[in-house]
């Protein structure tokens, strides 16, 4: 879900339904695949490639709409959205700590019961940072990732501010969260923080709103370089929306495996983790599914690989 939040989604539901694409996802519990509808290209083509669409886009991403949408989701009036959201996304509220939600944003960042996300005690096992759908890639010089409608090389993902050569031939794990997922995320191993950086999002057209000029969109990102106890140095990247703060990180010098690292508010929903070569053996189902471009559904704290 992008920065347009509920306003964008209600306004452009028809475009998203008409242009939706189906993503194939593997369920590890049932060992079956299912399809999930994703926002399609029709709405985006209208917004980015037509004069009327670009006029609308300027309004949607402007500070006025963003603030108005944020204020609504922070108000008590947004509570009316919760029952419909729970039903539509088939959310089992028995899994979550019972709270007196003050608004929709309060509900969206709800906390899950600890026993619902157990964690292995084996220090050599690598765990999923979040409830999500994961794809694994080998890190090559020409690897490109498409995340929330933007395409990046790994260097672009960290704003060309890091030397990532030491991760060549390693693993790139992309964890995509959908609105029905638990939006808190954790550390996959114990260790210490080496560096943290914030990259603001932006969107602009060159000279004109005319459809012949390209729109350049960059999502807000935060990344941490972590020295872990069992998997050497890793890069941990959170990807949010374009121009609003949807990532909330608990920045700390040291951390333990499975400890909460932060959470996404409405609009932030992707984690990318880079690991060095010969550090991680991923579970076979994730490897095989990724080769076929099938996402594997995983849970917060769930084991997804082991120390090589």
Language model features with spans:
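Contiguous, well-folded functional domains in the mature portion of proteins
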Residues: 2-4, 8-308
């Amino acid at each position: 879900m992008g920065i347009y939040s509920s306003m964008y989604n209600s306004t452009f539901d028809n475009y998203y339904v008409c242009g939706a694409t189906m993503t194939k996802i593997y369920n590890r519990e049932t060992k079956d695949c299912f399809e999930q509808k994703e926002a399609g290209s029709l709405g985006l083509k209208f917004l980015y490639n037509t004069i009327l669409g670009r006029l609308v886009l300027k309004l949607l991403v402007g500070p006025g709409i963003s603030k108005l949408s944020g204020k609504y989701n922070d108000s008590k009036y947004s509570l009316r959205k919760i029952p419909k959201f729970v039903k539509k996304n088939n959310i089992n509220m028995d899994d979550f700590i019972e709270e007196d939600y003050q608004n929709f944003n309060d509900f969206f960042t709800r906390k899950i019961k600890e026993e619902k996300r157990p964690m292995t005690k084996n220090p050599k096992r690598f765990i999923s940072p979040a409830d999500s759908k994961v794809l694994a890639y080998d890190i090559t010089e020409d690897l490109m990732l498409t995340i929330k409608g933007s395409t990046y090389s790994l260097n672009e993902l960290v704003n060309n501010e890091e030397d990532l050569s030491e991760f060549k031939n390693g693993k790139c794990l992309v964890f995509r969260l959908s609105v029905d997922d638990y939006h808190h995320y954790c550390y996959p191993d114990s260790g210490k923080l080496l560096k943290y950086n914030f990259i603001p999002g932006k969107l602009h057209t060159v000279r004109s709103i005319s459809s012949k000029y390209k729109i350049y969109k960059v999502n807000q990102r935060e990344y941490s370089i972590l020295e872990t106890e069992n998997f050497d140095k890793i890069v941990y990247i959170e990807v949010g929306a374009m121009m609003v703060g949807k990532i909330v990180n608990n920045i700390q010098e040291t951390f333990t495996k499975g400890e909460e690292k932060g959470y996404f508010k409405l609009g932030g929903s992707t984690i990318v983790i880079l690991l060095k070569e010969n550090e991680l053996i991923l579970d076979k189902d994730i490897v095989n599914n990724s080769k076929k471009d099938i996402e594997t559904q995983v849970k917060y704290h769930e084991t997804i690989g082991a120390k090589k």
